[in-house]
Design a protein with these regions (language model features):
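Alpha-helical transmembrane segments
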Residues: 29-43, 98-109
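Final/C-terminal transmembrane alpha-helix of multipass membrane proteins
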Residues: 137-157
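Transmembrane helix-loop-helix
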Residues: 79-130
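Intramembrane alpha-helical segments
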Residues: 1-22
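Hydrophobic residues within alpha-helical transmembrane segments
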Residues: 33, 80-83, 141, 145
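Alpha-helical transmembrane segments of multipass membrane proteins
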Residues: 6, 10, 41-45, 85-89, ...
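Solvent-exposed interhelical
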Residues: 39-83
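Transmembrane helix-loop junctions in multipass membrane proteins, especially transporters and channels
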Residues: 15-23, 54-58, 94-101, 124-128, ...
Length: 158
């Protein structure tokens, strides 16, 4: 539910506010697809943000998705979700925008991909490295890459 509101709903309300369009236009596929992809991205990312707190969750009796998947399962789930979401965005940008937007997105996701693979390889060797520090680095890098993408999109389309 949280992902739907933080992703889909926030995307639609923000799009509506920025573009000053009739609310009925929010139902078009050009707007619905990225709203759904935003939700999917958040749903894919959320379990990895909990990967470092399995012991605490278990002690409190919390049954999070990350805890149920296990550490490596959480990494696999997140990777699969990111790949599906990235393919969705690439298709969307190619179909509704242009190849430059698609390429910009892919280029700015490379640092995120490299870090994720690097961290995953470290976790395979030592499960203790699925920790708060690495999780927050992933969050910061993700925010930096995505914000850079959207900022450049605004600049190039201004």
């Amino acid at each position: 539910i949280v992902s739907v509101f933080q992703g889909y709903f926030v995307f639609l309300v923000t799009y509506w506010a920025i573009h000053d369009i009739p609310i009925s236009r929010l139902t078009t596929s050009m707007i619905q697809i990225p709203a759904l992809l935003t939700t999917m991205m958040l749903m894919s990312a959320y379990p990895i943000t909990q990967v470092y707190q399995h012991k605490e969750d278990r002690k409190r009796g919390d049954f999070t998705l990350s805890l149920r998947l296990g550490v490596l399962g959480t990494f696999h789930f997140t990777a699969l979700g990111f790949v599906i979401t990235a393919l969705g965005y690439v298709s969307y940008f190619f179909y509704y925008h242009d190849s430059q937007t698609m390429l910009l997105y892919l280029i700015l996701m490379i640092p995120l991909l490299i870090y994720y693979i690097f961290w995953y390889q470290k976790v395979i060797k030592s499960i203790d490295l699925a920790d708060f520090e690495h999780t927050m680095k992933l969050n910061r890098l993700s925010a930096l890459c995505l914000n850079a993408f959207f900022l450049l999109l605004i600049i190039f389309n201004a």
